[in-house]
């Protein structure tokens, strides 16, 4: 939903937007997100954005980041699936197939 005007988010509005998870829900039924993030020295941005994505309700998260951020990301967000880029300082490769993902975030870090 795209909203051209600012909207105040109160409990009533949020109750209409947010859904209760079914009791039989699991990571495979709650959506797969892709986060394209990270340059050298900016792994904190990746970590915060990845946590926010998972806390917002994504069942699975794939994080496309550079090789140098691998250890930091595996330690700070171990539940994220890492898709490591060949770039040393910043992302070089593009992701050709976005069909596995229900949402894509680009740009933090």
What are these regions (language model features)?
Residues 1-109:
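Small-residue (G/A/S/T)-rich helix-start motifs and N-terminal tracts that mark the onset
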């Amino acid at each position: 939903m795209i909203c051209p005007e600012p909207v105040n988010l109160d409990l009533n509005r949020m109750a209409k937007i947010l859904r209760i998870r079914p009791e039989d829900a699991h990571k495979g039924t709650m959506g797969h997100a892709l986060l394209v993030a990270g340059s050298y020295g900016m792994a904190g941005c990746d970590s915060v954005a990845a946590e926010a994505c998972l806390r917002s309700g994504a069942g699975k998260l794939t994080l496309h980041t550079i090789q140098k951020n691998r250890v930091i990301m595996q330690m700070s967000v171990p539940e994220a699936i890492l898709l490591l880029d060949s770039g040393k300082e910043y992302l070089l490769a593009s992701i050709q197939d976005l069909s596995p993902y229900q949402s894509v975030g680009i740009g933090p870090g």
